[in-house]
Amino acid sequence: MKEKQFWNRILEFAQERLTRSMYDFYAIQAELIKVEENVATIFLPRSEMEMVWEKQLKDIIVVAGFEIYDAEITPHYIFTKPQDTTSSQVEEATNLTLYDYSPKLVSIPYSDTGLKEKYTFDNFIQGDGNVWAVSAALAVSEDLALTYNPLFIYGGPGLGKTHLLNAIGNEILKNIPNARVKYIPAESFINDFLDHLRLGEMEKFKKTYRSLDLLLIDDIQSLSGKKVATQEEFFNTFNALHDKQKQIVLTSDRSPKHLEGLEERLVTRFSWGLTQTITPPDFETRIAILQSKTEHLGYNFQSDTLEYLAGQFDSNVRDLEGAINDITLIARVKKIKDITIDIAAEAIRARKQDVSQMLVIPIDKIQTEVGNFYGVSIKEMKGSRRLQNIVLARQVAMYLSRELTDNSLPKIGKEFGGKDHTTVIHAHVKIKSLIDQDDNLRLEIESIKKKIK
């Protein structure tokens, strides 16, 4: 009886937290096997589901455990039911059915797939901002056209969408070498269509794309505003693949509902499967990315240097990669192996505008000017009191410290009484958002800036 209550409570919590599609996939498909000695054994039909349960649902297991058992329950995940002795044979048969779509068609040479071999799931750094998208991509790699079709992933530039598309394709080809896979940016798809149309070779074009097992289209927003004939051809290609249960994965810089200039019937089809977003990596994920990008370069990137870099670039991965390239160039010229904060700062200054303003404005000067403007002392700013005027002054000072200096997030936090770097990020995002909405605050901050400079 308690086990049933416990599991029902978990499902209730999960339903409140997850979207409908994520709840159906991650929660409904899971099964509680037993609770014994404060350990809940939970069956998950797919191994990639464990990451989501660990990152997003583990805490609700703890809460439900205290509610029902008055004890802390620890989850243990299994991927084969104890009584299931034929799962491997079933899986093998399923895979044969899934992937052996076109036995009479010749497989596509890897060089013609458009895939980049370097992009795999193994070297994709996972974090809170991409966990759902990664899980969905892994699910697609395991069950083509059965899990999510289409899978639509959107997010800003440099967040890993292209990496994930290639990882899906490479994973499929690793397991099923004869699968017909094609990765192509939407702009290239459009140009390919127009070339075949001009040459009168549309049958060849249709055969190329409609015989695929997996179509990976990058930056589908490029299709917006294109002529009716172009959108019509993509619509027909989409339908032909979907009707034959072939997998389609799309990426975009915005969600389907925000794709302007596209026929409504296309937008509707983009939402048939699952839509997932990727958001900028958090501080810890940026450090992990930096570690991954620098470990084989032959240089010693000190830990405080990585933290400094992670604090400087918080919008996308490409900025981090660009900074690493600049740093290694300086290191080669100077013939040094140890990468210190000073070397990193030298490289970053060359990448940022208003160089003259960088590293010359002390944080305490910012605190002083902000404090004078709002009638708040530096001591109050560094403290933890939550009075409205103090909170505003503190957040404005953190925002300006981020905008006007070259200091890392941890360094800024330290200058505000040892605040965590996440507090600085929150302050920066909050004030930046308020500036867009509140002209008075924008003018106040501009006035403070003039006094600081």
Curated annotation (Swiss-Prot):
SUPFAM superfamilies: P-loop containing nucleoside triphosphate hydrolases, TrpR-like
Gene designation per UniProt: dnaA
PROSITE patterns reported in the protein's UniProt record: DNAA
Annotated Gene3D superfamilies: 1.10.1750.10, 1.10.8.60, P-loop containing nucleotide triphosphate hydrolases (3.40.50.300)
Subcellular localization: Cytoplasm
Coiled-coil residue windows: none
Stretch list, region Domain III, AAA+ region: 114-331
Keywords: ATP-binding, Cytoplasm, DNA replication, DNA-binding, Lipid-binding, Nucleotide-binding
PANTHER family (alphabetical): CHROMOSOMAL REPLICATION INITIATOR PROTEIN DNAA
Residues the record lists as binding ATP: 158, 160-162
Domain notes: Domain I is involved in oligomerization and binding regulators, domain II is flexibile and of varying length in different bacteria, domain III forms the AAA+ region, while domain IV binds dsDNA.
The protein's name in its UniProt record: Chromosomal replication initiator protein DnaA
Native source species: Streptococcus pneumoniae (strain Taiwan19F-14)
GO MF terms held by the record: ATP binding; ATP hydrolysis activity; DNA replication origin binding; lipid binding
